[in-house]
From Swiss-Prot:
Cofactor note text: Binds 1 zinc ion per subunit.
Compartments it resides in: Cytoplasm, Nucleoid
Keywords noted in UniProt: Cytoplasm, DNA replication, DNA replication inhibitor, Metal-binding, Zinc
Protein name (record): Replication initiation control protein YabA
Gene it is expressed from: yabA
Required co-factors: Zn(2+)
Amino-acid positions noted as binding Zn(2+) in the UniProt annotation, renumbered to this chain: H79, C81, C95, C98
Length: 114
């Protein structure tokens, strides 16, 4: 192969490599752009999760306060069940309907935490 042909082929190879490098550069810019967008989206989602968690905590506290109120009413000798709500219980008498409500209230709260 003569030197002119070699130079011509080398020039063609160089042009092909230049196109390949330009393509890789464009691909890299797209990946970097997507990466930046995903980082921003990730940060926004983390902030939303933090807000949701912050809103969830007071609901759990309200739930515990509600359970405590029901327990106090029941321990004071009054029914909290639908059938006898507000009526006085005899001393030492347990109501299975009231106890069922308290038990479900406690179990429901534990499921939400798990």
């Amino acid at each position: 192969m003569d030197p002119f042909s070699q130079l011509s082929q080398l020039q063609q190879n160089l042009q092909a490599m230049t196109k390949t490098v330009a393509g890789l550069e464009n691909d890299m810019l797209e990946v970097l752009k997507e990466n930046t967008e995903l980082k921003v989206e990730n940060q926004l989602l983390r902030e939303k999760i933090s807000k949701l968690d912050a809103n969830k905590e007071p609901a759990e506290n309200k739930s515990q306060a509600g359970l405590k109120s029901l327990r106090n009413i029941y321990d004071s000798g009054y029914h909290i069940c639908n059938m006898y709500y507000g009526s006085h219980r005899e001393s030492g008498e347990d109501c299975m309907f009231c106890l069922d409500i308290l038990d479900n209230f406690v179990n429901h709260g534990q499921k939400n935490r798990g």
